[in-house]
Every structure is written in C-alpha cells, then in structure tokens.
Amino acid sequence: MKIAVNGSDTEVLGASLAAVLEELGYAGAKIATAVNAAFVPAAARQATLLQAGDRVEIVAPQQGG
C-alpha cells in the first residue's frame, strides 16, 4: 500500500505501524511516531493499523547545544 512517510510517498507491505517501522529499518530505534498528525506511543504501534494514504511521521531525537 502507498503511504506518506515524512512527506515522501512510500510503498509498504506492513499493515501495522510497528510492521512498517521494521520494514523501513527502524526496529528498536528510539523514535517518536505520528499517524495523520496524531502521536502514537511505542506501546500502541503494533495495534495501530495503517490504511493507504495515511501520513506517517518518524522523528529521531537530535543532540546539540
């Protein structure tokens, strides 16, 4: 199915947010996620099912000062 990941159209096979994150290489990464502008905590990613056209945002923490 086609979804938008960080603003880029992406074809994915996974049905859940957790499966898509693993497919994209984010398994185990310390990241924040949102689907259609709604924050999705790590504990809810497996139960969060995606649909074609959904917008997924993946944000990794940045260090700096």
Question: What residues fall within each predicted segment?
Answer:
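Ubiquitin-like/PB1-type beta-grasp interaction modules and other compact soluble beta-rich domains
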Residues: 1-64
